[in-house]
């Protein structure tokens, strides 16, 4: 059902945690995968090597998505290397868990530049290729705080809420070319970068989920693969919650 043979995918933040799971799932479905990273070079190269060892096609691409010119250069390189682009997964993000009164303008700009402008940059650079594909897919990954809010995540939630609006608008604007745009809103996914905080608060955190566990990258990747495939061709402008029942909006 999720046959992606002959398609090219770009996954931002594709070398670690949820992004790594998405990169692997798209490759398993047959896509050639451009694995973007900002500073996590070793992790990205490991994911690429795993895909290649399994017989897939993948290549790492360094770019700070907050830098429009860097994104344009990355997308141009993907086109040169793979011949085009069919699938864009906006997965990279930046979250600073702080009380709003303790945040600084620098904190605001860092999170908005990555979470909102980063998605805008990638979509703008990729849009001509996605529309030319005739089956373009844009899938943006975010926390469910973007829909329901969360204490300590005000700025990141606001930035990601803007990305939801971006996806809905692009779904309307680009749909005539066969391009879809959707958001996936996540509950807390266990990952290496916040392992200490999760371990310290696990018992409290897990009680917020009707399904008494936190999420895994493997809970997310299959939905991305479905949306990227022909099976997702009539799903657009939607916000799909993968949150273990944390929110039921």
Predicted regions and their residues:
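A glycine/serine/threonine-rich, flexible loop-to-helix segment
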Residues: 172, 176, 183-209
């Amino acid at each position: 059902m999720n046959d992606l043979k002959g398609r090219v995918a770009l996954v931002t933040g594709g070398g670690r945690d949820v992004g790594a799971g998405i990169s692997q799932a798209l490759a398993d479905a047959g896509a050639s995968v451009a694995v973007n990273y900002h500073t996590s070079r070793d992790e990205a190269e490991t994911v690429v090597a795993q895909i290649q060892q399994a017989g897939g096609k993948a290549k790492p691409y360094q770019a700070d998505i907050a830098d429009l010119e860097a994104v344009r250069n990355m997308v141009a390189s993907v086109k040169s290397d793979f011949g085009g682009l069919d699938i864009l997964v906006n997965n990279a993000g930046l979250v600073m868990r702080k009380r709003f009164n303790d945040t600084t303008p620098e904190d605001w700009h860092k999170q908005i530049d990555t979470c909102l402008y980063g998605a805008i940059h990638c979509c703008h650079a990729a849009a001509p290729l996605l529309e030319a594909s005739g089956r373009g897919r844009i899938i943006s990954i975010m926390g469910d705080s973007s829909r329901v809010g969360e204490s300590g995540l005000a700025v990141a939630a606001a930035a990601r809420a803007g990305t939801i609006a971006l996806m809905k608008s692009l779904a309307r604007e680009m749909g005539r070319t066969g391009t879809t745009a959707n958001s996936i809103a996540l509950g807390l996914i266990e990952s290496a970068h916040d392992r200490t905080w999760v371990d310290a608060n696990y018992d409290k955190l897990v009680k917020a989920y009707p399904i008494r566990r936190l999420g895994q990258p493997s809970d997310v990747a299959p939905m991305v693969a479905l949306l990227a495939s022909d099976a997702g061709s009539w799903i657009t402008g939607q916000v799909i919650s993968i949150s273990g029942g944390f929110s039921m909006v």
